[in-house]
């Protein structure tokens, strides 16, 4: 018996311990602990144990009231009810089943004298229970019921307890972890920065065709070391200046180099922007510059309609061309260049053809695009500071055939600097092809390459070249009497709003080719290459290469160190002594050019180390 009596308590304790552990570790009962389940459980408890114990759970029964017998039992001591139960008793005792906070306080003090002397801490507990307990509902006063404070009532249908759920982790996508230099970065966004300047600069993003307004009221001393510190290959942008003269479009492409970049149309306008290298790989089909067409049409109306109205189609006044609605400037002024006239195009031109560029026989500098001709010209009222570069470079489009396009040979009073001609760009889809802008090497490192890289037509350098060549045109020296067919075809194109089909455009390209052949602008490829290499090795050699067609090399000679621009850029020769000598040398150079064979003019173009030359004959796909 002794052993049995000792074993029974141990067995009982083990059973109780196992039940306790199972109840503590098992959480199956937790979801079932809702308000309704608690109310039903309280009803069962009330039926089993009587009314005394159920009053302690009065909170769980919204209809519970307090009997006077119980009031008398707990009159002397602290009542065995929770604050929620006291609130329930108070509200249910009201005929309207609602009470204000002060009325609840008063009811508790009247029925339980303990709380009269218990201080004010219990009142805070009453307020907390009213606010936090789901069983109590706040009822606002009606307008016809004067008084202070809202009513409190018992919610007979409390909301079920919602089981807390673990928040799901947000899946990380690989696409979100993009680098700051990805194609989706904000560098293509081109935020619109509008300042109080009277003439902002409209910059066209060549990738997204977004338009950005930049403040053009910048200090003229800004250096590309701070604003344009990337390489030349990273610079390609056409900035459209909206001037106040009608619908004036001034295209000012900006490039960077070791010297300062300044003045466009006015000294206050300096659009500068960088485009990453990846933008250059996009095809020209993504460009859509509608303003270029409007610019060309305005130029045509201002210059060529006036010339057509004259009998001889010649002697266009310089004033009329200066008042042209199209003002296209492409300027670069090294810090040491002779630059005294801010409105003239006297700066040495920073373009990809600085040290000589290579274009294949049918692909010369101005890539002719199809349907929106753009003609850029701004006459230079200061001839000694007219920009000088390579001879005119015609660019035939992939559709060669028989019709002139307006690329006039512009006469210049200087013997070594034939004025650049105009470049008309057309594209069938109203989009404009452009040239890649690459940093030219120093003149001592010029090599005779004969190819064009695959990104030659990928960026805005064609626009830059056309702006550069047409920027210093002196229209008073132009003789268009021998190119009446060209003028007529241009007039017909203008009548058709420049909506040319392929055949008409091919005619224009063919006439353009004939025009440059007759004017001597298309020179021998071998001679040009030979002179580019030879002249680059001897930049100070006397001007005996004028007749060879390599006028760019000849223009670099006999310059003092103070006037030397950075390597790879055309130099501004000093003003020659007399106009007579100038004109004589100029005519001699022109006559020698006319005697050159009409072969494709080759220019050298500096290529990056990883660039691949494009030797494909684009005329073969026509």
From Swiss-Prot:
GO molecular function, one term: sequence-specific double-stranded DNA binding
DNA-binding region(s) from the entry: 77-168
GO CC annotation, single: chromatin
Keyword Transcription regulation belongs to the record: yes
Domain of life according to the entry: Eukaryota
Any single biological process term in GO: spermatogenesis
Thylakoid in keyword set: no
Gene3D superfamilies membership: Winged helix-like DNA-binding domain superfamily/Winged helix DNA-binding domain
Low complexity bias: start-end ranges: 332-357, 404-422
Pfam family, one: Forkhead
Listed SUPFAM superfamilies: Winged helix' DNA-binding domain
Alphabetized UniProt keyword annotations: Differentiation, DNA-binding, Meiosis, Nucleus, Phosphoprotein, Spermatogenesis, Transcription, Transcription regulation
Protein's cellular compartments: Nucleus
Chain positions covered by the region annotation Disordered: 145-178, 249-274, 316-450
Residue positions where Phosphoserine is found in the record: 223, 295, 489, 606
Chain ranges passing through the membrane: none
Polar residues: compositionally biased ranges: 249-273, 316-331, 358-379
Role noted for this protein: Transcriptional activator of MEF2C involved in the regulation of adult muscle fiber type identity and skeletal muscle regeneration. Plays an important role in spermatogenesis. Required for the survival of spermatogonia and participates in spermatocyte meiosis.
Protein name from the UniProt record: Forkhead box protein J3
Gene (name only): FOXJ3
